[in-house]
Amino acid sequence: MGKTIADILERNNIPYMITFGTLLGAVRHKGFIPWDDDFDMFLFDESYDKAMEALSRELPSDMFLETKDSEPLYFHGFSHVKDIKTVTACAQFPHDGLYEHKGLSIDLYRAVRMDEGLLDKYLITEHIAYLGRRFRINSIDKNVYEAKVKELETQLHDLQIKETGKELLAMALAERSMKIEHVFPLKKISFEDTEFYGPADADGLLTAFYGDYMQLPTVEHRVPHYDNVIFIEAQ
């Protein structure tokens, strides 16, 4: 799936990079982390819509582009590509089970370039919007929703916003941001038997994300994303 998506993006001159556990796997394991079956990509805000158009047009029939336009119960702040030949279960993220398509998923995160002084405002605003989408589809209790939104609106009101002139890359709902110099210029990095685009400074980015990222986690923290995967035979 990842190779198919990357081929479409590269053919349409749309920048992307592997990130999070996928990037960590590429550097530390030269591919998938043995206990991690997830796949993560960053797309960039200025070309995100173009990427969705290209994927919608060119993905094969056994993959589904899950967006706010194609999934009625959509609540994420980013899109996914789902494998329709599989069905998964994930106790860690039970709300994902609300979606019609429950197959293996590739996350297409949206990286937004902004002044670092605007980061907190952006993250709080996006969190409020996320809770609103969850509330709209009845996946969050009304009292919990109202209490969380009130708390976030108070934080937003109390912010001291001052632009610094220094830019970074942010992602909605993530506690991490990325330094521009860690990301650009993008460069190819090996993953299993394929090369994907990754950041300019993978070591710097992974250190910022995870600290001593070459140190393996303890056995109890080696938890797969999916609890179960069922492969559907072709009809």
Name these PLM-found stretches.
Residues 127-128:
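A contiguous, mid-domain pocket- or channel-lining segment that forms the substrate-recognition surface
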Residues 6-39, 48:
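Active-site nucleotide-donor binding segment shared across nucleotidyl transfer reactions
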Residues 123-124, 181:
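C-terminal, low-complexity/hydrophilic appendages and adjacent surface loops
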Residues 49-53:
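Short, conserved charged micro-motifs
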